Amino acid sequence: METSGAVATERNRIDVASRTSADSVDTAKPDGLAIRARALGLRYGRDVKALDDVSLEVRKGEHLAILGPSGSGKTSLLGCMSGRLKPTEGNVDSFTRVATIHQDLRLVKQRSALTNVLHGSLGSFSTLRTLFGFPTGEKRKAIDHLNRVGLAHRLHTPVGRLSGGEQQRVAIARALMQDPKILLADEPVASLDEENAYAIMKLLDELRDDRGLTLVSAVHDRRLTEAFADRIIELRHGQLITTDGSRQTAATSETKLPAASGNGDQATMLESRPQVERPAWMRVPAFAALAISAMVIYVWAFLGLDIAPRQLENAVPGMFGFIRNLFPTALAQLVEIPWPALLGSLVETVQMSLIGTTLGVIISWPLAALAAKNVGPKYLCSSVRVILNMVRTVPSLIWALFFVAAVGFGPLAGVLALSAYSVGYLTKFFYEAFEAVDPGPPSALGEIGASGLQRFRHAVWPAAKPAALSSSLFMLEYNVRAASVLGIVDAGGIGYWIKQFLDYRNFPAALACLTIVLVVVIVLDAVSTRLRLRLVNV
């Protein structure tokens, strides 16, 4: 892009107002301006000053590029412009609709390109309207945007399977779904090769011309900014400087470089901090003291249980004797086993496990949403977790006794016991899966205007679903084992027969029960393992 000397001079010009004059400027929308920042300051904690006395104006329809190294404050400045970050000093006004393309894109990688673009319209519709899908008109609009960014052939491809450049285009299309007048692009080409970086910057420039957008981009490559930007500013240590490196300050103000710097990217801030010393307990003397303390605790445990080596003298002969009694010594012992009744009780055991686990999943799902710190109300999280700890404390056999007393003997008591036991563990598995989700996509949908339920439905649940389903399969597996002993207290299943055979010391028949349960568990384990692997690779 060739420019005259006058245009080059204009690129280097920065509209800066002094703190004194900024206070006297009317906050009404000025003609020709899209964004105005006055004496802008932003701190993270007490030590990190991300922005220091930044004043500038962005005109409608221009492309303003912000240059600067990592940690210079580019992300923080864009965050203040979008309203995502609240300045600690000064103010910034964006006079029309703003959309942001984040450096880390913040796309839901488990969802298709089309669905991710549709997420851009979440702020325009109620939670109920988008609970089961999006309006047809919005889908047509999203397809048009994907076609405009060159991804018409990738509509239904999960974003996680797209290349870096393609994902960047999806993020651009999602921003366009918000019908912005101002587009903020935070390092839009940071992870791309030179060819793709040029293509993305060219696309952004074309979209600006086509749609009359005001474009503010934070870029670290000076060549790209010179090729596409109308005006270039530079940040260093949170302060505004000119492109030739000279300080840009107000005529009557003096500023000093801050002792610490940072920006809105928390990872960058953490990298800039000094390395933390190893904790005291990991140093050699402290570690030795911990090791000695652990040894003392174990000695105390053994002495308290009165475990003596002489108790092991007959252990091996005793084990072999028991194993020998398990195996039949005559064919008649096998014939006498009530095989039809055993197989019927085995089917009942599997049925109890299936229904009990399913009920547990249904109950655990909303409880996990309440217990997850990134989803539920903060004032409820701790209370729900305390209740869940109490539920997990009760063994499944005790739950069975409780429900036998409540509903009587039979499989219903077993089903209720398995569901109660499952809730304690599944809820923990689920809320841990919710909390492990990348916070970027839910945060991005929140900026768009999505409600809490919309963020959960469209960003948290898709990412957590593989882990949640995997946990449910594991629980079903476990419940088959647990259900096989609930019959001991007459709560249904094959456990009734196991108890009967052990009471009459019919060990071969008890072994037959355990063997058919083992076969079912092995088959179920093989199937669930394959399913879990497929879920993880989704």
Language model features: what each stretch is:
Residues E194-N196:
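Helix N-cap at the start of a conserved alpha-helix in ABC-type nucleotide-binding domains
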Residues L183-D186:
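Catalytic Walker B motif of ABC-type/P-loop ATPase nucleotide-binding domains
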Residues G262-T358, L370, N374, K378, ...:
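N-terminal, non-cleaved signal-anchor transmembrane helix
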